[in-house]
Amino acid sequence: MSRDTKIVATRGPASSDAAVLERMIRAGVDVVRLNFSHGKPEDHVARAQLVREVATRVGRPVGILADLQGPKIRVGKFADGKVWLENGQHFVLDAKCELGNAERAGLDYKDLTRDVSAGSVLLLDDGRIVLDVERVIGSEIYTVVRHGGELSDNKGINRQGGGLSAPALTAKDMDDIRTAVRIEADFVAVSFPKSAADMYMAKQLIHAAGGHAHTIAKIERVEAVEALEEIIDASDGIMVARGDLAVEVGDAAVPALQKRMIRLARERNKLAITATQMMESMILSPTPTRAEVSDVANAVLDGTDAVMLSAETAAGRYPVETVEAMTRICMEAEKSAEVSLDSEFLNQVFTRIDQTISLAAIWTAHHLKVKAIAALTESGATALWMSRLNCGVPVYALTPQPEAVTKMALYRAVFPLFMTQRPATRDELLHDAEQLLTNEGIVVKGDLIVLSAGDPMGTSGGTNTLKIVRVGDQKPWSA
């Protein structure tokens, strides 16, 4: 049984070895995330090269996601590496402080003093520490500790309710986009976007560097939630980044927001990745908790394209076992996923021919109970349209474009297959598609398949033809 939901795994010290990475890919990793918060450009080049070498050896298409660091809204370093804050004590955040202590800490983000005032609530280390702002004087923010605990170097800072003015794309991010293009990353994730303008800028920078990576907006700010539809429209996909998002909007609000984000992304023909602490306990444990199993399964049932692992595979003790567990959970959850066609989605007025053909293929496959859908595609757009509805029939995306193969590795219920050469005629296409699907063990003689293609062929966005084929009939396309 194939798995529809894709798995994104973060590369880190625990998964830097080629043998471990190979086992992870064999276990089910579809996209490898490179965290650009760590490492130099040459490090990312080497990591991307290793991913591609291992994926080629395994024989699976594996995409690469470059995750930009974004603005560093964090405390600075401490003289002893960490301090303990007591409830009720006074604590100062000082933009001019070099090394912190138990009474004050420095700031990486020097403009924080402009964004807060008396009455503001600051959440440190993913909300584990809560500070109430009393007053702001010059470079110093005077606070009282509401909820204390251990605070160590470089922990993140959020303002309850949002409102931090740091730009989404820093100078480092702009340099990193050029590196992402250099390594031919399939996806670039933008951290902390506040508006559609942030995503349009990221796209412009990618194109200016000569790249074609899909942009993924990480929804982790209150402002991003408020501008959600515009941000989705300006992006190729979104990441439900539940860590910082939960800190800003409150953890109880996240489950409903997750469902809304995934639904809106699918309605707009965009990708959705669900991330953060999905299998967190497996950093130290060989098995997930029951709550984590339910969390992953619910994301699958919500319709997410992919579920993502962060520290679990980057720094955990059991990176391979974590991927294996996530694969099992996804496959089991998919057995319960409702196979139905959204009538509201199908009854909308279509504005594109390729969209119309794509959804007609899904409708036909669902009602005719065919074995497979074969979509000849240049860019992957046709396959993406098809993946927005769950008809219970797998979509095999046939493409002569290597970069389209690895991009489609993230599309739910889409299985990309590389065609070594572009068919010159529709009869060649029919023959090559049948042969490829047969050689892969997907269909046998007598099976029905739905085939979509463009006429003329080789044009991105040109899908305009649908044909129902019985494998082995050997009839010409026009028959």
Residue ranges and their predicted role:
Residues M1-A479:
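Non-catalytic helical/linker scaffolds that mediate oligomerization, partner binding
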